[in-house]
A protein has these predicted regions:
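Membrane-anchoring alpha-helices and their flanking helix-loop junctions
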Residues: 34-123, 135-195
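Leucine-biased recognition of intrinsically disordered, low-complexity hydrophobic segments
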Residues: 11, 22-23
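Residue-identity detector for glycine
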Residues: 26-27, 37
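Solvent-exposed interhelical
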Residues: 126
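Extreme N-terminal basic, low-complexity initiation segments
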Residues: 2-13
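Extended, alpha-helix-rich binding/interface surfaces that flank or overlap catalytic cores
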Residues: 131
Length: 195
């Protein structure tokens, strides 16, 4: 049972007799999940918290703590250099995040944790790191902490990174290993988790 699905920017070739079918998009490779991977598991990564909620919560908590129990110069007391440096970092984080999300859209898969991953991305920023969106969140968060002069936000980054690593990334990787099998293990061997 082989069929081709023509779309504006990519061609999907599906061969259910093989463990993995190939998606070719603009010369970039992605792998479809095997039939066994789709049938034998819940089809999403069971993360403890969605990363946007984790980072937004840390920003709000950091600002609240900075207001109630000030550390350092105080919330919103950044000078021009701090605003420029923090703003530049925030823009870098936003740009990296946008490039990363664009790869999901090009491949036709969901970027939202808790929804099925239909392809293994290996193009764009995913050639250099397995988690460019989370790196983008960290850069954006760090930039905001500098702009807001919130020492609490910087301190909260430590538990945020632990929760991100243990409660999100490790669970997503277990899901992707189960779903994409050998293709994901080869990707893990070739591309670092972070940088």
């Amino acid at each position: 049972a082989r069929h081709a699905d023509f779309r504006v920017s990519h061609l999907i070739v599906t061969d259910y007799d093989r463990p993995c079918a190939l998606l070719v998009s603009g010369g970039k490779r992605c792998f479809r999940a095997s039939r066994e991977g789709r049938q034998n598991m819940q089809d999403y990564a069971d993360v403890v918290v969605k990363p946007p909620i984790l980072f937004a919560g840390a920003v709000l908590l950091g600002c609240l703590l900075s207001w109630i129990v000030p550390l350092g110069p105080g919330l919103g007391s950044a000078n021009t250099r701090a605003l420029a440096a923090g703003g530049a970092l925030a823009l870098v984080g936003l740009a990296l995040g946008a490039l990363s999300v664009r790869e999901f859209r090009r491949a036709g898969t969901s970027v939202i944790p808790g929804e099925p991953s239909t392809v293994l991305l290996e193009s764009g920023p995913y050639r250099y790191t397995r988690n460019p969106i989370y790196i983008a969140f960290v850069i954006l968060y760090f930039g905001l902490a500098i702009m807001l002069t919130s020492a609490w936000m910087l301190l909260l980054l430590i538990p945020v990174l632990i929760i991100l690593e243990r409660g999100v990334v490790e669970r997503e990787e277990a899901y992707l290993q189960a779903k994409f099998g050998e293709a994901y293990r080869k990707y893990q061997a070739r591309v670092p988790r972070w940088l």
